[in-house]
Regions:
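C-terminal motif of bacterial Sec signal peptides marking the signal peptidase cleavage site
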Residues: 16-17
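Short, surface-exposed "cap/lid" segments of acyl-processing enzymes
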Residues: 56-106
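Serine-hydrolase catalytic core
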Residues: 63-67, 212-354, 359-379
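Short beta-to-alpha linker loops that shape the active-site pocket of alpha/beta-hydrolase fold enzymes
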Residues: 105-110, 173
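Catalytic nucleophile-loop/oxyanion-hole region of alpha/beta-hydrolase
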Residues: 111-138, 143
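Gly/Ala-rich beta-loop-alpha elbow adjacent to hydrolase catalytic centers
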Residues: 146-150, 154
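Active-site nucleophile loop of the alpha/beta-hydrolase fold
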Residues: 169-179
Length: 380
């Protein structure tokens, strides 16, 4: 999810019927879908580096195949403003354990933020529906995974399709921590942007994600959250679920997510990884595994919404990676120091501490341990 200095806002439960500005690839096999999406990106993207080929591949749907016959499949869905790069590491980890893994690109993403002005939740759902069905035709057992908004989308699909074997939910955006997100559907037509685009201060995008999103993007995020909560209220979800959240997430109502896990995700083999101070529920619930998220030896003040996904070895987002996110809710002089390559600490959006410059935490020091917990859940 993208942050704004201005409050994000709104709730109407009917979906907008707007058409996307971009032509969507038709329903096809995955290889054709990927090639058509690559062409769409190439035609519409505002490239951020001189290496257009790399940017195309980073933003396009990906597939990882295991050695030998796959024992199952996993479809992974990114979040608002993100791209398939979100699963660069997790995809490889799962494929190494025998799964065929695929990612999708949600409409409006991977090109330029303006292309989200008219996108709809229904279009996002269509991509998930088509590619989940395609994967189900190819392997006997399919799991779905999602990050943030993507977690809402796969939860919705799983509630409608009992053949889905389980879920992997990374920072699931069941409920925002903003009291105003419900307003965004009402104001998107009069205020297309919550943060003015191209203001000379706030970057619009990086090679792999947007840093500014139209109001309509937040509106569709809101709709997906409402839908996820409706599904959870419908009935408990009884398949194995792996979930991971951080206490200091600047996007989510993490207490609501924790309570949802304890009350609605009932499989005894499900696990929730919680980064932060051990929640009160953890001692009573062996399914909740807590780890400290203050790691001063690594200059980590707190974990972030997005950092849970990435290995420290990630070539873009690791501590030695090429994509340091300095737009992190701090004063402009601190942002300039970060961009100049000075030593930094890491945090989620908006955290400040005297005498320290904070970049966004974009890697997870517990990645290997977290992956083993995830794989154990898949083995249920």
């Amino acid at each position: 999810l993208i942050h704004s200095h201005l409050p994000i806002v709104l709730c109407a439960l009917a979906l907008q019927a707007c058409a996307s500005r971009l032509d969507e690839p038709p329903a096809t096999g995955f290889d054709s879908y990927r090639q058509q999406t690559l062409q769409l990106i190439e035609n519409h993207r505002v490239f951020q580096t001189a290496d257009r080929t790399a940017e195309l591949n980073w933003n396009a749907p990906q597939q990882w195949r295991p050695n030998g016959t796959p024992k199952g499949g996993v479809l992974l869905v990114h979040g608002l403003g993100d791209s398939p790069w979100s699963f660069h590491d997790i995809g490889r980890t799962l494929a190494d354990q025998g799964y065929i893994v695929r990612t999708v690109l949600l409409p409006g993403h991977g090109t330029r933020p303006q292309d989200m002005l008219n996108v709809t939740l229904a279009q996002w759902q269509q991509v998930v529906r088509e590619q989940a069905a395609q994967l189900s035709r190819e392997v006997p057992k399919v799991y779905l995974g999602g990050f943030s908004t993507g977690a809402n989308l796969v939860l919705d699909y799983a509630y409608q399709h009992d053949d889905i074997a389980g879920l992997l939910l990374f920072s699931p955006a069941f409920r925002s921590d903003s009291a105003y997100v419900w307003v965004t559907p009402w104001i998107s037509w009069v205020r297309p942007w919550l943060a003015e685009p191209d203001d000379g201060v706030r970057p619009m995008q990086t090679p792999v994600r947007y840093l500014n999103v139209p109001t309509n993007g937040f509106a569709q995020f809101h709709y997906s959250s409402v839908l996820a909560r409706q599904r959870l209220e419908q009935k408990p979800y009884g398949k194995p679920v792996f979930m991971v959240i951080t206490e200091h997430d600047s996007v989510l109502d993490t207490r609501y997510v924790l309570d949802s896990f304890n009350q609605r995700f009932t499989h005894p083999g499900s696990r929730l990884v919680w980064y932060g101070t051990s929640p009160q529920a953890a001692p009573q619930n062996p399914r909740v595994l807590a780890r400290n998220d203050y790691l001063p030896e690594l200059h980590i003040s707190q974990f972030s919404h997005m950092g849970l996904l990435f290995s420290p070895d990630n070539p873009l987002y690791g501590p030695q990676g090429s994509q340091r996110i300095c737009w992190n809710g701090q004063p402009l002089p601190d942002m300039a120091r970060c961009m100049a390559g000075e030593p930094v600490w890491y945090s989620d959006w908006g955290y400040q501490e005297p005498g320290k410059v904070h970049a966004r935490l974009t890697f997870n020091p517990y990645y290997q341990w977290q992956s083993q917990v995830m794989l154990n859940v898949l083995g249920q």
